[in-house]
């Protein structure tokens, strides 16, 4: 385990660095001697930003795009087909290919816009008091699923106790 060195730089800021990295402090500047990248130093980028979401760099593009809310398996494949891109690792994409992917993703309703759209649709159902809206209000499934056994995940927030063996009253 590497030892860390904490050196106060300003009253509210402290510098934490590896002991491999040498630090020279003067009154006016802070200078770092570069570390050999073979020894594990240096900057490594682990994510790519597409559609205001950081997608993983070490996975194939088809699976990386699925980290964006609103893009599933079929939509990710459709994006790759529209751009005629190979399904290679995200870090292997060139800048031009990455720009093409970003432009293609902006054509779809994703992330905040999609969440807002769904929230407005559910709010409208609740306001008009239709069956689906009432089921949303009650926290029950609204697509015809059984409720005797399998709607526990929807009712999780309410914590309804399941009828079972009753405990005998304790001694007073």
UniProtKB/Swiss-Prot annotation:
Q: What is this protein called?
A: Small ribosomal subunit protein uS13c
Q: Which species is listed as the source?
A: Spinacia oleracea (Spinach)
Q: Which GO terms describe its molecular function?
A: rRNA binding; structural constituent of ribosome
Pfam families, A to Z: Ribosomal_S13
Q: Where in the cell is it found?
A: Plastid, Chloroplast
Similarity-based family:
Belongs to the universal ribosomal protein uS13 family.
Question: Which HAMAP family did the record assign?
Answer: Ribosomal_uS13
What does this protein's UniProt record list under function? Component of the chloroplast ribosome (chloro-ribosome), a dedicated translation machinery responsible for the synthesis of chloroplast genome-encoded proteins, including proteins of the transcription and translation machinery and components of the photosynthetic apparatus.
């Amino acid at each position: 385990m590497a030892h860390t060195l904490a050196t106060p730089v300003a009253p509210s800021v402290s510098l934490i660095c590896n002991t491999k990295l040498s630090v020279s402090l003067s009154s006016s500047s802070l200078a770092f001697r570069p570390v050999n990248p073979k020894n594990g130093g240096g900057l490594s980028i682990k994510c790519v930003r597409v559609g205001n979401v950081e997608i993983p760099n070490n996975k194939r593009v088809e699976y990386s795009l699925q980290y964006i809310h609103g893009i599933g398996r079929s939509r990710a494949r459709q994006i790759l087909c529209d751009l005629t891109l190979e399904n290679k690792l995200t870090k292997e994409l060139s800048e031009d290919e990455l720009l093409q992917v970003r432009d293609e993703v902006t054509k779809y309703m994703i992330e905040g816009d999609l969440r807002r759209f769904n929230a407005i649709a559910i709010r409208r159902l609740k306001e008009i008091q239709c069956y689906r809206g009432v089921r949303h209000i009650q926290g029950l499934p609204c697509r015809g699923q059984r409720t005797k056994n399998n709607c526990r995940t929807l009712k999780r927030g309410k914590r309804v106790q399941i009828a079972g063996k009753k405990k005998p009253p304790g001694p007073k």
